[in-house]
Swiss-Prot record:
Pathways involved: Carbohydrate degradation; glycolysis; D-glyceraldehyde 3-phosphate and glycerone phosphate from D-glucose: step 4/4
Protein name: Fructose-bisphosphate aldolase 6, cytosolic
Pfam families in the record: Glycolytic
Expressed in which tissues: Expressed in roots, rosettes leaves, cauline leaves, stems and flowers.
Annotated GO MF terms: copper ion binding; fructose-bisphosphate aldolase activity; mRNA binding; salicylic acid binding
Natural source organism: Arabidopsis thaliana
Length: 358
């Protein structure tokens, strides 16, 4: 039983439930300056503040897109940015019924005593930062822990360390009014089969919920952002129905019914793959006490980015590409995606990056 008694408890529960509204999901636009620089470089656009702002403004002002979203995760820079007409992005999102979120981790560092496994930094001063972000309008937060599958990985040490880091982050967020998104990402890198991924996912999620319980985290005021259960990147692909079955079973075995929603990361899948897999999960006839939705970054932005190319004259077309993906994923949260989205440039290409750094 959680003994959590934050003054924010009712607000946390309401906001977590709202983010998990079927038909809506999260746009992850919280790429660090370095990561968004790589995205911009792929379309030959310079990584300067004005270009980063232009890309985010393109996304946030797309007609018809925001009704498909319940939240947008921002990088600290974007939390304080304004659109070209002077409207703060936070106000723009809130007026459209979209909750602003904030990435609060400080990236990964190697975990001593392991074979290249990592732990996530950012707990120092986290309470003060959360307080500041809440005052700036943020209502949820994200912290990414990263695990990998190998012959002996993930080690028990890495699982424990990352689970407890996520739990400490979660309770600090809740003390300061932010709904924590708990993100234990198991990288798709490797040649393992889907059964191996399922077994590891179950181990990791079980450890996370034990840690959250130990820290008295209010589960009704949290969200889970896991990987889908898939074969490794060097293995043969399987059908969306197979991914759906293995993923939902792993979640049934480990995620308490008190959690309102599970928002999947795309993990380097192509835009279309990620949507089809989410749709298959929502079509599955089985027990699902939580809503199943999306928190996609690359899988919502790739075709938009390619279409835009940094050119003002392409903004309208790029926004049309973004709307296509938003609508497709909105339908997938209802199990209603027909696979008929007009595929923009790059929509079918794998977005996998080995050992991905966010």
């Amino acid at each position: 039983m959680s003994s959590f008694t934050s003054k924010f408890a009712d607000e946390l529960i309401a906001n977590a439930a709202y983010i998990g509204t079927p038909g809506k999901g999260i746009l992850a636009a919280d790429e660090s300056t370095g990561t968004i620089g790589k995205r911009l470089a792929s379309i030959n656009v310079e990584n300067v503040e004005s270009n980063r702002r232009a890309l985010r403004e393109l996304l946030f002002t797309t007609p018809g897109a925001l009704p498909c979203l319940s939240g947008v995760i921002l990088f600290e820079e974007t939390l304080y940015q304004k659109s070209s007409d002077g409207t703060p992005f936070v106000d723009m999102l809130k007026s459209a019924g979209v909750l602003p979120g904030i990435k609060v981790d400080k990236g990964t560092v190697e975990l001593a005593g392991t074979n290249g496994e990592t732990t996530t930094q950012g707990l120092d001063g986290l309470g003060d930062r959360c307080k500041k972000y809440y005052e700036a309008g943020a209502r949820f937060a994200k912290w990414r822990a990263v695990l990998k599958i190998g012959v002996n990985e993930p080690s028990q040490l890495a699982i424990h360390e990352n689970a407890y880091g996520l739990a400490r982050y979660a309770v600090i967020c809740q003390e300061n009014g932010l709904v924590p998104i708990v993100e234990p990402e198991i990288l798709v890198d490797g040649s393992h089969d889907i059964q191996k991924c399922a077994a590891v996912t179950e181990r990791v999620l079980a450890a996370c919920y034990k840690a959250l319980s130990d820290h008295h985290v209010l589960l009704e005021g949290t969200l889970l952002k896991p990987n889908m259960v898939t074969p490794g990147s060097e293995s043969a692909k399987v059908a969306p129905e197979v991914i759906a079955e293995h993923t939902v079973r792993a979640l049934q075995r480990t995620v308490p019914a008190a959690v309102p929603a599970i928002v999947f990361l795309s993990g380097g899948q192509s835009e279309e793959e990620a949507t089809r897999n989410l749709n298959a999960m929502n079509q599955l006839k089985t027990k699902k006490p939580w809503s199943l939705s999306f928190s996609f970054g690359r899988a919502l932005q790739q075709s938009t980015l390619k279409t835009w190319g940094g050119k003002e004259e392409n903004v309208k077309k790029a926004q049309e590409a973004f709307l296509v993906r938003c609508k497709a994923n909105s339908e997938a949260t209802l199990g209603a995606y027909k696979g008929d989205a007009k595929l923009g440039e790059g929509a079918a290409e794998s977005l996998h990056v080995k050992d991905y750094k966010y």
